[in-house]
A protein has these predicted regions:
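Hot-dog-fold acyl-thioester-processing enzymes
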Residues: 2-64
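HotDog/MaoC-like acyl-thioester-processing domains
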Residues: 2-12, 45, 70, 75-79, ...
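Short alpha-helix capping/helix-loop boundary micro-motifs
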Residues: 65-69
Length: 113
């Protein structure tokens, strides 16, 4: 992977907690949006930007669209690797894409934007 692309993506890991699952031990679908936010925030932080500093300057980063595609379930106690990737930007818009995998596995569980 080239250096420029590496700077435009970041992967964080989190262990699925019991409260993030449904009665069957599967990650509740809406929790992936929280996982995406964690990865996105850390990617931005690595680029030297902190949300609170943006807010102090009167800027807000609002989510105006979110989409997820479920390929395979995450389960209680899985360690998930969530990758956020800067997919595009414009004068008033930034787009991030996401992939979720179990740590150490190639299978993509969830993709999103």
């Amino acid at each position: 992977m080239n250096e420029e692309r590496r700077q435009l993506e970041h992967t964080v890991k989190t262990r699925v907690r019991y409260g993030e699952t449904d009665q069957m031990g599967v990650v509740y679908h809406a929790n992936y949006l929280s996982f995406f936010e964690i990865a996105r925030t850390e990617l931005i932080r690595l680029r030297g930007v902190v949300y609170s500093a943006l807010e102090e300057d009167g800027l807000r980063l609002m989510v105006t669209e979110a989409g997820l595609e479920y390929h395979s379930p995450g389960r209680y106690d899985d360690v998930l690797a969530i990758t956020a990737r800067l997919a595009g930007s414009g004068p008033a818009r930034v787009r991030f894409d996401y992939e979720v995998r179990r740590e150490g596995e190639d299978e993509v569980l969830v993709t999103g934007h």
